[in-house]
Amino acid sequence: TLNWEQVIEITPILYDSMDRLKRMKESNRFNISVLTHVNSVPEIVEKVKFIRKYFDDITIIACPKELSKTKMVHAKDAILIDDYSENLREWKAAGGIPVKFSPTKKTTEFLCVDRIDQVLDIL
């Protein structure tokens, strides 16, 4: 069985994203929530524990992997920053604003960022 605590703790991009998310929150330009696909209860437990180390006032929405993120929240006019293109296509189809997170920034289909706080500069 996968040790989600270990996976989250050894993923440096998550730590950087928390710093970037803090910058976005401090801008007061966005109503920020974390919408995350999960495969299991242990995974969401570890994700929540990790996020709560940095933020006690951000809403965390766990979406079962079998459901579209558009079924969990109202996407219309909302921004989704995601690394998975299919999530972004569904988000756009539901009237949302898709932004691709990609360290390589190789996409022409979506606005693309390699740091989540870059949305402050492009939106």
Regions found by a protein language model. Give the residues of each.
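Short, acidic loop-to-helix structural element flanking the phosphoryl-transfer center
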Residues: 2-33, 42-45
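A short acidic, amphipathic alpha-helical/loop segment
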Residues: 19-23, 72-74, 87-94
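Short coil/turn segments at beta-strand junctions that form active-site/ligand-binding loops
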Residues: 28-31, 75-78, 96
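Glycine-centered loop/turn motif at secondary-structure junctions
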Residues: 28-29, 55, 95, 102
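Structural recognition of alpha->loop->beta junctions
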Residues: 50-62, 109-123
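Acidic, Mg2+-coordinating phosphoryl-transfer loop and its flanking beta/alpha structural elements
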Residues: 79-116
